Regions:
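Substrate/ligand-engaging "lid" and interaction regions
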Residues: 2-489
Length: 489
């Protein structure tokens, strides 16, 4: 019989579900998390749950919070089940489930209530998952966008803010006025230098209100950066039904994720932190090398298989990974051209990390799609592939595979796969990309799009390699070009 999840049913759940191995009544709050989505509950909440199961860090339980309508919807779903979440790991060998109990409360979705809770001394860390767009970055300058309408509205009425950074400013100002130590602001969003992004937003907002307050925040508030990783697909009715049928539990807001998770944190917590190193979190002095490793090996790998996977007619990522040509192409490209550009990290084997990445890409249970990886190529290629090309050229190293990857992306932008089936190009620059692709595959001399490629647009070595790869694709087709690359020196 299916049971609705709450504290009263934990002892009656089947043995197939791991339940909390700690007395929840012994927990007290230490972290307030803004943006309680799927990723937070599959990642940070699970790490803390593991720590509590060791009987440690019991004063670091999570209080959920948010300011958006979807935060209110999440609160409404979690409240009747006592803030519990069923986390199902999509392992190729079979599903596994656990009830995560590290969240003990969720503040009313109301800015004054949130500010009040932030000003309680038990809150020593404020963590964030508010998405990349939530940091109000000016697309032109890269700085904090103080002219954004939502920010302007808060600045006109700073006593009643409605944005995350207006709320954080108000809470920090009140804590300072009452001589209470500030909390640490810990971004858990999946973007490079997330701590610097959080600092830029909080200080940028503060400086628009009070220079003295901004100076105090810069001097006294810590913003550690972190690298986070765990594939967490969206939860829909299919996932809720899967959990009902497999585990006999009714959860209004379950989470599904891959078994892999990683968290590397800059160890900068002046107000204290839980001992998460005991449950697998890596604390380091500098997160940047780990971010670069992930950016190039994992994100670069996604970019590498996306377009060739689409051109060879694959729908799912795991299907592409069973294609011997694509798997061999990815392994050669990563091993010979991408991995050597990542600076060494003591104690980390990049080949082992690559093997883990390829295993993750091969996980059929996750059901990741090629079309998702192909989205916004004009935004992703400059982040994940072009910097690697520049690094190799600066060191006079060959770029044969990377030029082929770029040519495969260009071929994808023509809008059809190798069998002639239509490809829907989902990119804000779709029209420009199509025009570029038609030009590159019709002219005797293939060219690149200057606005996108920057200095590579005039680099003769890159242009020659790109032209060679595009010409080969045009003459031989995708399959034979791949085979030629894989079997080559």
């Amino acid at each position: 019989m299916t049971k609705k999840l709450d504290m009263t049913v934990l002892s009656t759940l089947p043995d197939t579900i791991a339940t909390p191995a700690f007395d929840r009544s012994t927990l007290s709050a230490g972290i307030l998390h803004i943006g309680v989505g799927n990723f937070h509950r599959a990642h940070q909440a699970v790490y803390l749950n593991r720590l509590f199961e060791r009987g440690e860090g019991l004063d670091w339980a999570i209080v959920g919070a948010g300011l958006m309508p979807y935060d209110r919807a999440m609160r409404d779903r979690l409240h009747p089940q006592d803030w519990l979440t069923t986390v199902v790991e999509l392992d190729p060998g079979g599903l596994s489930a656990q009830v995560c109990a590290s969240m003990i409360d969720f503040v009313d979705v109301d800015p004054p209530a949130l500010i009040d809770r932030l000003c309680q001394p038990d809150i020593r860390i404020v963590s964030l998952t508010i998405t990349e767009g939530g940091y109000f970055v000016d697309p032109t300058t890269g700085g904090f966008d103080v002219s954004h309408p939502e920010i302007l509205a808060d600045l006109e009425n700073p006593e009643k803010p409605s944005t995350v950074f207006g709320v954080l400013y108000a809470a920090l100002a009140r804590r300072r006025a009452t001589q209470m130590a500030p909390f640490t602001v810990m971004s858990c969003d999946n973007l490079p230098e997330n701590g610097l992004m959080a600092r830029q937003a909080v200080v940028g907002y503060a400086r628009a209100v009070s220079a003295k307050q901004a100076d105090w925040i810069e001097e006294n508030v810590a913003f550690p950066s972190g690298m986070v990783d765990c594939i967490t697909p969206a939860t829909g009715e299919r996932e809720r039904a899967l959990i009902r049928e497999t585990f006999d539990i009714e959860d209004a807001a379950p989470v599904v994720c891959e078994p892999f998770r990683q968290w590397v944190l800059e160890d900068n917590f002046p107000s204290g932190r839980p001992a998460l190193e005991k449950v697998g979190v890596e604390f380091v002095s500098d997160v940047a090398p780990y971010e670069l490793m992930k950016l190039r090996i994992l994100n670069g790998g996604h970019a590498a298989i996306a377009y060739v996977g689409a051109l060879r007619g694959h729908h799912f990522v795991h299907e592409a990974m069973t294609d011997p040509l694509i798997r061999a192409y990815l392994n050669k490209l990563e091993s010979e051209e991408i991995l050597p550009t990542v600076p060494e990290i003591p104690g980390v084997s990049f080949q082992t990390y690559l093997a883990t990445v390829m295993d993750r890409f091969s996980n059929a249970a996750v059901g990741d799609t090629i079309s998702r990886l192909c989205l916004d190529g004009s935004n992703r290629q400059p982040k994940f592939i072009l910097p690697v090309i520049l690094d190799r050229l600066d060191n006079s190293l060959n770029i044969t595979g990377l030029a082929l990857e770029t040519a495969l992306w260009c071929r994808y932008c023509l809008g059809s796969d190798e069998a002639g089936r239509e490809i829907l190009l989902e990119d804000e620059n779709a029209d420009s990309l199509k025009a570029w692709a038609k030009s590159a595959f019709s002219d005797s001399t293939a060219t690149v799009w200057p606005e996108l490629f920057g200095p590579l647009a005039t680099n003769t070595v890159f242009l020659a390699e790109f032209e060679k790869a595009a010409d080969k694709l045009q003459r031989l087709g995708v399959t034979d070009t791949l085979a030629d690359y894989v079997s080559g020196p």
